[in-house]
Regions:
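A conserved acidic beta->alpha catalytic loop
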Residues: 42-50
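Conserved donor-nucleotide/metal-binding helix-loop-beta segment in metal-dependent transferases, i.e.
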Residues: 99-117
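C-terminal catalytic/acceptor-binding lobe
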Residues: 22, 154-157, 161-167, 171-247
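Short beta-strand-to-loop element that shapes/binds the nucleotide-sugar donor at the catalytic cleft/hinge
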Residues: 118-132
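Short beta-strand-to-loop acidic/aromatic patch adjacent to the donor-nucleotide binding site
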Residues: 85-95
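Short, well-formed alpha-helical segments that are part of the catalytic scaffolds
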Residues: 16-31
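Cell-envelope/extracellular polymer assembly enzymes that use nucleotide-activated donors
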Residues: 6-8, 37
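Glycine-rich, basic loop-to-helix element that forms the pyrophosphate-binding segment
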Residues: 66-82
Length: 247
């Protein structure tokens, strides 16, 4: 493949087919290195995902789930379909704004084996704890290398759009057995990883008001009580981990 990179675009979708079409159109228009294929996994099995992928100038394969699996099980199922050493992970609610980001991400990851993935989002949209991360250069690419020590779980992995090594994911085993995104990030943190953010953003989130609930119970809380309960659960888990690590 061009640039020495053999990769697959792995994209999860769940019923938001107008956003999926928008994501795919911008992605196909901006990919600077061609993937082996784009694999879309439609959680819930809605055939509208196939219509959203029609007519685009790219090798796109759509897989329809049998029922709802939830985010992490859907990701596990999707990645079981991928036979390339690299994957560009994506979801169905992003719009890509420039080209060049695949080659930049590959160069950065080749230079920094401690980086798990490369985010394309503006750093000003990310967690306030890391917005002041200084800009540096890795692999000839301007970027921000996040400090995992700034949070007990975050900043070592993200499922935001970005390139990643399949070997790092396979080393963890099934992600659904680990938990949610924060738990996966913690697993990467314990292996010495961080993630990086390109200094020049290449994507924007277009699904802010279109959140999809997760049947596995990992959905974002929407009421003050639900947010308080989630915060309490997180604090309890952190205390349990701390005592377990000290034992």
């Amino acid at each position: 493949m061009a640039g020495g990179l053999v990769y697959t675009v792995a994209l999860t979708s769940c019923g938001r087919h107008d956003l999926l079409r928008r994501t795919l159109r911008s992605l196909v228009a901006t990919l600077d290195l061609p993937p082996r294929e784009i694999v879309v996994f439609e959680d819930g099995g809605d055939p509208g995902a196939r219509a959203a992928a029609e007519g685009l100038d790219a090798p796109i394969r759509v897989i329809l789930a049998e029922g709802r699996l939830g985010q992490m099980r859907a990701i596990d199922r999707l990645y079981a379909e991928i036979g390339t050493p690299w994957a560009f992970h994506c979801e169905d609610d992003w719009e890509f704004t420039r080209t060049g980001y695949v080659a930049e991400s590959h160069a950065l990851l080749a230079a920094r084996p401690d980086v798990s993935t490369v985010s394309l989002r503006p750093i000003g949209e990310l967690n306030p704890l890391i917005r002041d991360t200084p800009e540096t250069v890795a692999g000839g690419v301007r970027c921000h290398l996040l400090d995992p020590a700034r949070h007990p779980e975050y900043f070592s992995y993200t499922f935001n759009p970005g390139l990643r090594r399949l070997s790092d994911l396979h080393a963890l085993g099934p992600l659904a057995a680990i938990g949610g995104e924060a738990d996966v990030s913690l697993a990467f943190k314990r292996r010495g990883f961080r993630y990086a953010v390109l200094a020049e953003p290449a994507v924007r989130h277009v699904g802010w008001e279109r959140h999809v609930d997760d049947p596995a119970g990992l959905s974002r809380p929407r009421t003050p009580w639900a947010r308080w309960a989630r915060s309490a659960r997180k604090r309890f888990r952190r205390l349990r981990r701390r005592f377990s690590d000290d034992a």
